[in-house]
Amino acid sequence: MLVIILGVIGLLASSNLVSSSTSTRVGGHLPLTFDPPENELGYWCTYVESCRFCWDCEDGVCTSRIWGNNSTSIVENSYIKYCEVSRWGDQCRYDVEEHIYYTMNCSDPKPWNPYKIARKEWKKNEHFRKDLKKDEF
């Protein structure tokens, strides 16, 4: 009888955990990836916006994959980082290229951007050129 009661309590507890973790904007498990699902980009890029998968870069100018042409374009520099993301239950984790880890509760996300100082907005008349070595003139 005690085993049955404990089993029922365990079942109720686990169903409560499942419903609370799936009520987040992203749900289920996501194995470590450099390329999160397209429908989750808005979530992942809102909280760590310097991840490379958040940006489309061409000729040194990057545009947000989430906000597109309605956002400010930025210069491709050390602000843009390779990130891997994963999710296990209610734990969302970023692994940034220098093996810096940021973990947050998926249901209570907090923005994190230590690279913001490197962000440089692109100005329309700004041109990029490769730094030439002396013998490349």
UniProtKB/Swiss-Prot annotation:
<comment type="function">
    <text>Plays a role in virus cell tropism, and may be required for efficient virus replication in macrophages.</text>
</comment>
<feature type="glycosylation site" description="N-linked (GlcNAc...) asparagine; by host">
    <location>
        <position position="105"/>
    </location>
</feature>
<feature type="glycosylation site" description="N-linked (GlcNAc...) asparagine; by host">
    <location>
        <position position="70"/>
    </location>
</feature>
<feature type="glycosylation site" description="N-linked (GlcNAc...) asparagine; by host">
    <location>
        <position position="69"/>
    </location>
</feature>
<dbReference type="Pfam" id="PF01639">
    <property type="entry name" value="v110"/>
</dbReference>
<comment type="similarity">
    <text>Belongs to the asfivirus MGF 110 family.</text>
</comment>
<keyword id="KW-0732">Signal</keyword>
<protein>
    <recommendedName>
        <fullName>Protein MGF 110-7L</fullName>
    </recommendedName>
</protein>
<feature type="signal peptide">
    <location>
        <begin position="1"/>
        <end position="20"/>
    </location>
</feature>
<dbReference type="InterPro" id="IPR004848">
    <property type="entry name" value="ASFV_fam_110"/>
</dbReference>
<keyword id="KW-0325">Glycoprotein</keyword>
